[in-house]
Amino acid sequence: MNWKFWQRRDDTIGPDPTEAHPLGEGFSSGDTAGGDSSASGLFKGMITVAAIYLLAALALGIWWSQEPDRFDIETAARELGQSGDTNVTGYLTTATTITVAKTLLEKPGGYLTNDLFAPGIWLDNMPSWEMGALTMLRDTARVYRNDFSRSQSQSAENPNLAEAEGKFFFDNNSWFLPDTEGEYKAGIVYFQNYLGQLSDQSANDAQFYARSDNLQAWLAAMDTRLGSLSQRLSASVGKRQLDTSLAGDANASQSTATPAEQMVQTPWLEIDNVFYEARGFTWALLHVLEAVENDFGEVLDKKAARVSVRQIIRELEPTQETLWSPMVLNGDGFGLVSNHSLIMASHISRANAAIIDLRALLAQG
């Protein structure tokens, strides 16, 4: 009952406490509805942002997974911009090695192996490719330090090359303190310093010796790597393999016993990793082989071996053909599905055999 004569009904706030009302009548639900609407809008906004992020990461991942194209070694050598003589022995091979290292860091997405965030952390094919190219770079840097830059075993090593080798052998998966990219960039700088010394005709503190034994040392390193890659690629389908570790030497021994026969097979989840590692290694090797043909031209011509180097290049070129399949296929033997690993192993095995023949030819006096 509204017994206060000065208070009109429309001035009251809420229900009359003296009158009975159904439970809940007179209370507004506007605040509750507004809260639910705000929470729903926030949730939808978060979903939208997450979807946009995932789509952008997917697009970047596809772009970053594109392998670098082959480059022209002479153009790359000119672009390095050394002020000295660019026609000196070893200049083209050194400039090519530097360009391979720079491409490893400057390709789309940069260096991905040590990434901690999307999309880099989701990718595994490109880090495997980087590992292959890095392996070739490390082997070449070691041969530079021990062979290419030294006249004989008792000669002093070049300090720039000694530092460069250590930088390139730094952990390939370090994100911080120090980061891998920083160490590899330092290695490139040391190689550029060596290149500058080579092109300076007024200085003789750095040399590149284009000799047959030096070339054999580098080919031996490449031979070993190609042989390993060929075996790992061939094991994609699994095969029974005899132990030939001590074959050819009746007096040889080994530290621990191994089975006379064992099944060798690459784990299923590692098949594409081995495939892309092989592509990265052969990509880098192709460029350095082209430079070696130029810098060791006189040595090769004396043995009529220039055509052998060109044949090795010809055997390796198919390893860089476009992979049209969205994934690395692993068909079994002569089955209906292609086996990309076996095709890659075939090309690498032929190139490896040609390198072995070239080494034998160079060793013949």
Functional labels for PLM-detected ranges:
Residues 1-30:
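N-terminal intrinsically disordered, acidic low-complexity segments at the extreme N-terminus
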Residues 2, 74-79, 273-276, 282-365:
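A cross-kingdom marker for long, charged
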Residues 29-39:
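Cytosolic juxtamembrane amphipathic/interface segments immediately preceding
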Residues 46-60:
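Hydrophobic membrane-insertion alpha-helices, especially the h-region
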Residues 59-73:
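Hydrophobic single-pass membrane-insertion segments
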Residues 74-183:
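N-terminal Sec/ER secretory leader and immediately downstream segment
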Residues 115-125, 171-178, 262-272, 325-343:
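A cross-kingdom feature marking solvent-exposed beta-strand/loop segments within repeated
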Residues 184-313, 320:
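Extended amphipathic alpha-helical interaction segments
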